[in-house]
Amino acid sequence: MAKNLITKKLKNTITDDMIRVNQAGEFGAQRIYDGQLAVLKNDKTIKKMAQQEVKHLEAFNKILLERGIRPTALSPFWNLGGYLLGMTTAMIDRKVAMACTVAVEEVIDEHYKSQQEKLKNNTKEKKLFKLITKFRDEEIEHKNTALEHNAKDIKGYKVMTQGIKSITKLAIFLSKKI
């Protein structure tokens, strides 16, 4: 009996952490696009991607509330950090903003893929699995769109994207528990 209770609590903790980090990530992504759009105001491509991120954030906000999961305490940092990252990359050049999108979305692709692996046999989380699958497909679409818009044509592409990937991975790690 006690073992079943511990196992159930552990499974809930795992999905709670997933939802918390996904909500934080979608919030950060929205703030990156807000920063980019502050500079590239009429960019239809960025606006379209930003609109999808708003829907992603709304979905995870809803799940967070429904399940009574606390959001990350790091939201104020992701608020400012995401906005500054987006604004700074857009101020340098539109292609740099697109390279930022590629870097973030490559990490998110792997992050969501890992979550899919953990959830694929969990019959109680089919709805969450489908949502993550849908959002992963859209994040891959964002990456591909950014690549189509010459993201790789900037000097220092590898160095810049590796830096952004490292920051994104750190944000994911911290947001799971804090």
Feature-to-residue mapping (PLM):
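Non-heme di-metal
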Residues: M1-I178
